[in-house]
Amino acid sequence: MSQSIFLDTINGIKRERPPVWFMRQAGRVLPSYMKLREKYGFKEMMENPELAAQVTLLPIHDLGVDAAILFSDILVIPEALGMELSFEGKGPSFATALKDVADPLSFLSGKPEKLEHIYKAIDRILETKPNEIPLIGFCGGPLTTLCYMYQGFSRNQNFPDFVPAIYRDKALMKKVVAKITEMSILYALKQVEHGVKAFQLFETHAGLIPVELYKEVFLPSVKAVLGAVREKGVKTIYLPKGLGTGINMVNYDLCDCVSVDWQMPLHEVRGIVGEEMILQGNFDPRILEATPQAIDQEFEYFLNYGRKDHKWIFNLGHGLLPSIPVENVEYLVKKVKESDWGR
């Protein structure tokens, strides 16, 4: 048994309760984060190691969660491939999208030095974090990363040009995915080298295309990135949001832990992925916009589930929304920590 309830659980060790952390826990749901945003832009905070470290640790102090996740963005990989990224206005956008480029493979050039500030941020986080709190590193999944690279921006998670482009020239897309994979492996291994204790791959748009197409074009990349991390002895988490019944292709050969969205109950997922896999998820973040009574009601399922399954990390089906009252997040953390899990 270690100091960290998160690391014990992801290693299959039974603890007195499930660990709790949230995707997007270091973000707009926190008043302390919004105070910093009054002074600094998002990209500025991300690229300043001191600020990135500070933001990463805000939810540890403010919410009492059991793990920190690096404050960064999935779109640093396209930047490291030479694309110019901006966060001005409504979300991320690229100066030139791949759909507007005649030869995407020549357009993409390796600039791994663009990621150096992130490794400095990791060093700073490890200098200042509490001992019992592990740091989770991450990168975007290949499909999700390429969605943004190809379209150039996202409006309401809509990528109208991207999916037809896969069908038009699958061979080209596979070559672009290979470039994303190569840079993602380099990035992931550097994070491990600098001290992250677990690594999550965010495939936020896994449900955008048919499962068989995902399996052919993108899943080999997922295996390569997570496999490289696992070879270093670091536990891996895979979030395939929207994959639905396609989750049956997620097994222990692919990752150590699968992060589940809100579409399927945990007990059904457990039946599909088997007993060895650690589960993470899958409280619907939108419940946190309701009343404490509604939270109590929904929490009951998770309490009953966690009494039977210790290989489970309490998290959300996706990230915290800016509209969620921070009091409700605090309330949920308290419920996880103070409930009787019968272990």
Where are these regions (language model features)?
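Active-site loop segments of alpha/beta catalytic cores
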Residues: 114-343
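Glycine-rich, proline-tolerant flexible connector loops at the mouths of alpha/beta enzymes
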Residues: 70-86, 105-110, 196-214, 317
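N-terminal basic, low-complexity leaders that serve as flexible interaction/assembly modules and, when applicable
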Residues: 1-89, 215, 224, 324-343
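A charged helix-plus-loop insertion that forms the helical arch/lid used to bind
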Residues: 86-99, 155-162
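An N-terminal domain-start capping segment
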Residues: 35-53, 105-114, 145-159
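A short acidic, glycine/proline-enriched capping/turn motif at secondary-structure boundaries
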Residues: 74-77, 92, 101, 142-144
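Short glycine/proline- and acidic residue-enriched helix-loop micro-motifs
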Residues: 41, 101-110, 163-173
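A gly/proline- and charged-residue-enriched helix-loop-helix capping module
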Residues: 90-128
